[in-house]
Every structure is written in structure tokens, then in C-alpha cells.
Amino acid sequence: MVKSFNLKAIRFAVRVGNIVAPELTARATFKLFCTPPRARRLSQKEAAMTQRAEQRLASARAMDLAYRKGPYFDDAGRDQTRDAPRDETLRYYVFEPEAVSADTQTVVLLHGWTGKSAFMLGFIGPLLAKNFRVLAVDLPAHGASSARQLHLPKAANALSELHQQTGPWHSIIAHSFGGAVGCVLVSGFIPSFAKVPLKRLVLIATPHSMQWIFHGFGRAVGLNQRSQTLFDGLVRPLAGRPLGAFESKNMLRDADVPTLLMHAPDDKEVPYSGAELMAGGQRCVTLLPMPGLGHRRILYAAKTIRAATAFVCDADLEHSPVAG
């Protein structure tokens, strides 16, 4: 997130702000944190795959969902989202199998930070071949969806409304930040959002802790302890819970949904140790190491797509706890 900005200038401003205006500094840092770069440089392989994916998107039914901004919680913890305007739009693409029937179920694809739905389209063909309907979503502030900022509660809010319009859903397949969104949805972890019932959840290179992400960002831009505490505290009014509560392991435990974690031990962006923590001792969670695939290559690997499809399709798959 920080690489796309002038980090040296940001660190200088934060160093001054820590002293003279810590609250303003925390709010400005939060806005920066929640603002995805408009585009990142794609590798040659990513660019070629994205071009093919964009062509495939043209064959889908493109839909826009108008949703309310939020959530917003007052000082007493009451959700005020119902009073927010419905002036944001979420773009999603609907792919239908050839033989739609009463038994056709829906799988939702969620991309990661700075991604878009086109990055997830490697899963489309195999899922359609198994007679699933597929929804490929552009998260807020990404792809063709509106908004300029995105955080976990905002994503959960938009996806909860999408579920109300298009559910029930059979499964979610999600990468990185999208996996964190999936954890929130399936657990109903944010107050006022009901659990999204699923039969399967596939998480690819998903972070285990929002606090770990916040503190890493704070160190990168130079927040001192007071400003970091204020920065962390901005989560509760948006999420109805403190930052430290957002641990994926706890959300997966509360969800109790069969879950497949795929993570590369060589991932340099989201550490593999987090996946081990998420899976450790969990009855319904299976960890599948994917060595050599890093944080982004894992998304396009044939074995990742095969494993995700098999997991979603296997109604009789048994899950055993994976030790951390």
C-alpha cells in the first residue's frame, strides 16, 4: 500500500504530526491506509491473463448494486447505517452454467487489495463445468465499483447487501484481503450483519490479523505509540468491535464452516505462519501448503484452481485439524 506514495514525504509529515497533532495524524493515516492505489504494475503474465479475463468478462452479465455507505456505530454501539444514503455501487459479474436448474448453486469470487474481479477468473471455467453459477465481484474502490476508500467493515457491508440480493451462496473463494472479508461474512463478526451461511470457504494467502496489518502500516509511515493507538481506535466506530478482535482464527471458529486454506511458505507479503495459526486446532479448517507460489502467483496456479474446485464440489470431504 505504501509503495505507491512518496514514503519519505509521508514519514516526514507523520513525524511532525505525531508531536503537534496526533489525532489529525491518525485520521490522515487511516485515510491513506484505506485508499488503494489506482493501479499497480502487472507482471507480463498477469497482464496477459488479465487481458484474456477482460475478454471473458464481456460474456458475463454485468450488474451494479446500489448500497448504503457504512457501517457506522455511535458511542453506544448502535448501528446507524440505516440512515446512510444509498449512493455507492458495487459491480459484480454473473456467469451462468449451460444447464441452469433448480440445483444450480452460487459461488462468489473475492479478489485482494489492488486487485479486481478479472484476477479471479481462472476459477470460472472449472466451476461452470460443475454447474455452479459464479459471481465475480469488484470490491469497493476497485475495478468498476465506486468509492475511493475501502476498509473491512465497508466491504462486509457491501457484500452483505449483495448476499441479500443474490443469495443463498454455496461457497466463497477469496484471495488475500478478500479472504479477510470472507471471514467476516461467514462469521457475522461485525454487529448488525447476520452470518452469511456457506457450505464451503476457500481462503488463498489470507492475513490472520488486522492488527498485524495496521501495526505494520504504522511502522512503515512512522507513527509513534500515541498516534498508533489513535489510529487503531478508529476501527471501533466503523466495525462495532476493537481492532484486536479481528483475528481470522476466531472468526473461522465462530463460523464452523468447512474451510480450505492455501498459502505459500515463501509468501513475502502475508506470512505463512499466520495460516498455521488460523488452522491450528480448528475442526473444520484444512491447511494446504503451496510452496514456491508466493503471494500472487498462487492465484493463477493450476493446482490452486484444481484444489479450490475439488474442495467446493466435494460434499463428503472430511476435515481434520491441522496442527500449527
Please name every model-derived segment.
Residues 117, 124-146:
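Conserved alpha/beta-hydrolase
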Residues 149-170:
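Alpha/beta-hydrolase active-site loop
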Residues 173-174, 178-182:
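Gly/Ala-rich beta-loop-alpha elbow adjacent to hydrolase catalytic centers
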Residues 254-256, 261-263, 267:
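Short beta-strand/loop motif that positions the catalytic acidic residue
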Residues 293-305:
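Catalytic histidine-centered segment of alpha/beta-hydrolase-like enzymes
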